[in-house]
Amino acid sequence: MIYRSKAPLRIGLAGGGTDVSPYSDLYGGAILNATISLYANATIEPNDEKKIIFEAIDRNERQEFDWNNELPIDGTLDLLKGVYNRIQKDYDLKGQGFRLSTFTDAPAGSGLGTSSTLVVAIIGAFTEMLRLPLGEYDMAHYAYDIERKDLNLAGGKQDQYAATFGGVNFMEFYADDKVIVNPLRVKQQHLFELENNLVLYYTATTRESAGIIQKQSKNVTDNKEKSIEAMHQLKQQALRMKEALLKGKLNEIGEILDYGFKQKRQMAEGISNPLMEDIYETAKKAGATGGKISGAGGGGFMIFYCPGNAKYTVMQRLEKFGGYSRNYQFVEHGLKTWTI
């Protein structure tokens, strides 16, 4: 038997960063995101040799171990080993050898939630193999727990919940790891129009999000008013985006994104940089009414809202920066698992 899973990556549309502690614990966070047709994929193939083989196909990395209850977290394939260690501890694989292969449709550090989505996909493959009765909230919290507590990776909570639930969601974040996911019933024509007008542009640079997120968290802990006020405004931006999508006020989306872009830069150093500022201004001059940096910032993907047929001019003008626009569709489903 072969056990497979795939979980969708996400575009953050508004409220990004307010899902990160301690802000979400102190003030409550709100984010609006949508999953897209780029995926993190995982496959588990059992073997009879008591060998554990990890393979990240897209990164050309491979490790092989004799069976062990706990594998070293040493900087190579840590997400794969971290999930294995936790699954083995909680559910006992009873010495079953296997090959775990993964592939992600976007680079790590690109701002689409790749790392957390990959963790969800790996957990999904194990739950398929072990027939574990985990629901969407259970799965997302389990992934969050592995990343933050077992692997000590800094970050928020939205990616894990987007990957498990899928679709367009308004998410609320509170103290004690409380998360509420509100699926939005956006009319199909409005979703098609959003998809048509939203350019997903890869800057051809990646970044380590943890450093930016740690600065952001420290700014809240140190009670830096400028940073905290920016997060308050981003939370309001998520509410405005929710209303615009539900009521079909798509002409407001560019302005909401533009406002959020200006606020997000206030949250921590390193979120934007001269290259991203130049890309942003070029897109606006070409007809985009607003945009944002996807994820924590510092590199990776940017999105631009381009009404009318402005997206063609925007994509053409951005070619000079050496990145590329990525085709996608919005998808309604979250994590999927199956056996063959």
Regions found by a protein language model. Give the residues of each.
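C-terminal nucleotide
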Residues: 1-12, 19-20, 25, 31-33, ...
